[in-house]
């Protein structure tokens, strides 16, 4: 059997308490029983060691100093002739707390190697054989519970010293605070302060993304192609999915509100409240059109409860009482391609002098700059890497609509002064509107130019906008000469000639007017008018379909008001017999059908078909079975329609006002306030 190099018993004895070589040294060596137990029971039985603790141990001579004594010099390994391996130690080990031994000097358990960190000299460390009462407890210099930064330092300390696993007071400061529970607290004053934890960080312009509760259908799956011409699917009874999503998203945008501290910081401006920031860019200082830092908000009017768009000009000071006179002229203009101005006023709600303009609000509207040049304002946008280049058909549509807006503006003796890609919004499919009209008239009221000159500037800005869209070049980097040459190669000569007419100054013999412009593009005006008519026909057809759905809804409300009238249980004239009993069974026939296995049948086609036949009153007979399956009725839809009209007529008479007023007292139902809209 192989033997080890060192005897384990001798090595353990050397580490614990080295035995003196001679009896001459025992009188100065303190007995270990005194250190461990406080007394030695062999003191009077021949123990050769010293038992007097007050007697200090003399400083050992250099010749008798032990190799592994705590007072020995720090071990420094000799330099090897061979290159040593590079050691890797944590950078945080240098800042570790100095270890002070508790009772005895910490002696190494083996021979140190070249890879170990040098032990600092223990010059001020108390001797291992000094008084126990004078020994200092281990106290770390700094408590750091970050495992990522203090892992190396913590590894050099003895974790078993003064550790109580059931005491958490030392780490209480590092533990997270208890989460606020709004349901367990009776005091709800802290609900607002703790409510921000349930939402993302409230930044400027942040809007809540929690959708409202839309109780709308969500069709799943494609259309069936194996239907016969006389067959219909569920989709045929409702509006198209894309139109429904568009309307639903606009409703969602209209109902969005700000949350957290951002909502509390929004003031009430005049008669407008619940302000929501609509700006999509944080670069406010680049507003070169107005010359002021502008902000756009969505707000609710306190007078009409309608939504409006507010544009704020920060730091504008009104120096003339007549500066708001142009607003009256702009409020008279009504055009399908102009965002109508509602009001203008000054406010100090933000602590400065700001000028506010109120316009009509169109949810999910985006500017031409955002739609066609998304990368110009978003350097790291998640949208498409290429701009949305407008085709020539779309360009002619824009030209016709802007011409329509200019015709309405110029005919009233005004100038648009806002034909810019950042001030023209898209509110529908290729439907654009001029926004911010009239703001420059208020700002430059004291520096007004002749109206003919301002209208001429409208034509020039109009031409530059079309060139920018045709060449897919942002307005800031547009080289007009090269852009027109490029447009001539990619587009028709008619479009190029129209743009040159807009950019060139008028001839000496005449003046440029919108009528002259419309006369030159009359062919494209007819094309745009035809597209508008077809769009109107499509919307009307969808409206007709929803009217049919409204008829079904009114019939359902009548059936719901007739069935299960508990307040008339004791009324002999309103007992569930005869016609009313058949209506109750008809409800089960339409909505409570089951299959052969007793599972509910959910067939929208069956429900709509039965309700439509009931609304018309056909002669078709159906069999109504009682719930106990003992009685059957053969009735026609015409008879059921008469029963509905008769029973509902009695309810109208009993209401007292013919419009669904309060029911019999003591029923427990809420009192309904009639209005002119309560018509069936």
UniProtKB/Swiss-Prot annotation:
Q: Where is the composition biased (Gly residues)?
A: 655-669
What are the record keywords, sorted? Answer: ATP-binding, Coiled coil, Cytoplasm, Metal-binding, mRNA processing, Nucleotide-binding, Zinc, Zinc-finger
> How is this protein named in the record?
PAN2-PAN3 deadenylation complex subunit PAN3
Oligomeric and partner information: Homodimer. Forms a heterotrimer with a catalytic subunit PAN2 to form the poly(A)-nuclease (PAN) deadenylation complex. Interacts (via PAM-2 motif) with poly(A)-binding protein PAB1 (via PABC domain), conferring substrate specificity of the enzyme complex.
Task: Zinc fingers (C3H1-type): give the ranges.
Answer: 25-54
| Pfam families, per database record | Pan3_PK (PF18101)
Give the signal sequence positions.
none
Its biological purpose:
Regulatory subunit of the poly(A)-nuclease (PAN) deadenylation complex, one of two cytoplasmic mRNA deadenylases involved in mRNA turnover. PAN specifically shortens poly(A) tails of RNA and the activity is stimulated by poly(A)-binding protein PAB1. PAN deadenylation is followed by rapid degradation of the shortened mRNA tails by the CCR4-NOT complex. Deadenylated mRNAs are then degraded by two alternative mechanisms, namely exosome-mediated 3'-5' exonucleolytic degradation, or deadenylation-dependent mRNA decaping and subsequent 5'-3' exonucleolytic degradation by XRN1.
Annotated region described as Pseudokinase domain, given as residue ranges:
256-522
- What InterPro entries is this protein classified in? Kinase-like_dom_sf (IPR011009), PAN3 (IPR030844), Pan3_PK (IPR041332), Prot_kinase_dom (IPR000719), Znf_CCCH (IPR000571)
Source species of the chain: Pyricularia oryzae (strain 70-15 / ATCC MYA-4617 / FGSC 8958)
Chain intervals with Low complexity compositional bias: 99-117
The main place the protein resides is cytoplasm
Which PANTHER family does the protein's record reference?
DEADENYLATION COMPLEX SUBUNIT PAN3, PAN2-PAN3 DEADENYLATION COMPLEX SUBUNIT PAN3
Q: Which PROSITE patterns match?
A: PROTEIN_KINASE_DOM, ZF_C3H1
Q: Where in the cell is it found?
A: Cytoplasm
Q: Where is the composition biased (Basic residues)?
A: 670-680
Q: Which GO terms describe its cellular component?
A: P-body; PAN complex
Lineage of the organism: Eukaryota, Fungi, Dikarya, Ascomycota, Pezizomycotina
Keyword Signal (UniProt): no
Q: Where does ATP bind?
A: 311, 360-367, 422-423
